């Protein structure tokens, strides 16, 4: 074995991605690969000067956004790792949601068709956000959306 890898210690992490003591487990393996981001990619939303919120399980600070993935800056949408770290399937679905919402805002899709398409995407996202890990992501996303609604009321933005 040229890598010298004989195993890995895995552990649960808290909302700051720090290991939770007592949850460590050793797994025998000869290769370790990382295939997902561990922190949100917020460079572009930062340039747009959107409002950020602490999303905990989604990787710390992320842009505040509504159910259509629109941020506090009208016409600026986020999806995938820019809206919080999840998984590729969720990122794809969020991209669809943002695209549908943007097309609707531009008058390229009528409201009824957009509503139906967004409902299908939300059904898919809700299915992806189940189970022991998905439920936490679901709750974190709902909290972001709630905070966005509060922000809209406070800032007279609708």
Label the model's feature ranges.
Residues 1-158:
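Residues forming the flavin
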